[in-house]
From Swiss-Prot:
Coiled coil: none annotated. This is CRISPR-associated protein Cas7/Cst2/DevR. Keywords: Antiviral defense, Fruiting body, Sporulation. The gene is devR. GO terms for biological process: defense response to virus; sporulation resulting in formation of a cellular spore. It comes from Myxococcus xanthus (strain DK1622). Induction: Part of an operon going from at least MXAN_7266 to MXAN_7259 that includes a CRISPR operon with transcription continuing into the pre-crRNA locus. CRISPR (clustered regularly interspaced short palindromic repeat) is an adaptive immune system that provides protection against mobile genetic elements (viruses, transposable elements and conjugative plasmids). CRISPR clusters contain spacers, sequences complementary to antecedent mobile elements, and target invading nucleic acids. CRISPR clusters are transcribed and processed into CRISPR RNA (crRNA). Disruption phenotype: Essential for sporulation, decreases sporulation 100 to 1000-fold, aggregation is defective. Belongs to the CRISPR-associated protein Cas7/Cst2/DevR family. Subtype I-B/Tneap subfamily. InterPro entries: Cas7/Cst2/DevR_bac, Cas7/Cst2/DevR_sub_I-B/Tneap, CRISPR-assoc_Cas7/Cst2/DevR.
């Protein structure tokens, strides 16, 4: 049976504002959704994938890279020729992990179009704020001519508001190493997710650290994750707890031996919770937990 890797991440506390450059009138707005009956802010999976691709490119060449000067993506193999059945070319890590799609319309009437598609092996969920958005908005004023495209008429500042949210974000990933052309890339992906850094959407101006403060890995032969969005806000150390996950472990739905936990959430565990998690690997650091999860992958590969 295949080994599946699932992970739940939660970021440090930070302040999000002006994500994706959306506006409502003169208010720069955050993306929002209703979560458990309350309004929460959210960051798209594509924003996380974009940040991850940059990290991956620092480890080995990626097919798709972003040119900050031209503000456009560049492709080394736009035809994805390395993925043809008979090709012996080396594939790019981002294509292998994150997938691709290239569709072309029919060149002549009555002919069918073609598409080259690879589904992402590394699937990423949308990030959701750990706490509801309370409606915080700051008042700002842009000075006349603040940017070359700003309003040129008049000498008065231009007022605008900015929605902001002081919170943590949590998201999850799913990965089946055996589905990769190069299975060892699963280790690279986990390492880079644990050192992700800033994530923001289009025109995002805010700096928000998306490196996880706490993490839960599950390495299992079961196809169901059962740990996504496992974190809940808490007043204990680290600001989070894992009540729902602990119930699943206690009931036998998630075997403790399949889990690797790391970060501040471990420091906040009580004696009874540690007893429930007997058999799981507990690390006070995220990096140590990531290394432990990667070690399990490497042992499995052997």
């Amino acid at each position: 049976m295949s080994l599946h890797v699932f992970a739940a991440f939660v970021t440090p506390l930070g302040t999000a504002a002006n994500n994706r450059g959306l506006t409502e009138g003169n208010i720069t707005s955050l993306q929002k959704l209703v979560w458990n009956g309350q309004v929460h802010t959210t960051v798209s999976a594509e924003s996380i994938r974009f940040a991850l691709r940059r990290r991956l490119n620092e480890q080995e060449p990626c097919n798709r890279t972003y040119d900050d000067a031209s503000r456009a993506n560049a492709w080394k193999d736009a035809a994805f020729s390395a993925w043809s059945g008979k090709s012996k070319e080396k594939t790019y890590i981002d294509d292998d992990l994150l997938g691709f799609m290239s569709a072309e319309g029919a060149k002549q009437e009555k002919e069918k179009g073609t598409a080259k598609v690879r589904r992402a092996v590394l699937e990423v969920s949308r990030a959701v704020s750990l706490t509801p958005w309370s409606g915080d908005v700051t008042f700002n004023a842009a000075s006349p001519g603040a940017t070359p495209s700003a309003q040129k008429k008049g000498s008065n500042p231009v007022p605008y508001g900015t929605e902001m949210h002081a919170t943590r974000y949590q998201y999850g990933v799913a990965l089946t190493p055996e589905a990769l052309r190069v299975p060892a890339r699963a280790v690279t992906a986990l390492n880079q997710l644990c050192a992700l850094g800033p994530v923001a959407g289009n025109h995002g101006r805010f700096l928000f650290d998306f490196s996880p403060e706490s993490v839960v890995f599950r390495l299992t032969q079961e196809a169901a994750p059962r740990i996504l969005y496992a974190f809940e806000p808490s007043s204990r150390a680290g600001g989070v707890e894992l009540a729902a996950l602990l119930r699943k472990v206690k009931s036998g739905d998630v075997p403790a031996k399949e889990l690797v936990l790391g970060g501040q959430v471990v420091e906040g565990l009580g004696a009874e919770e540690r007893e429930v998690l007997s058999g799981a690997e507990l690390h006070t650091g995220v990096v140590a937990a990531c290394r432990a999860a990667c070690k399990r992958l490497e042992v499995r590969k052997k």
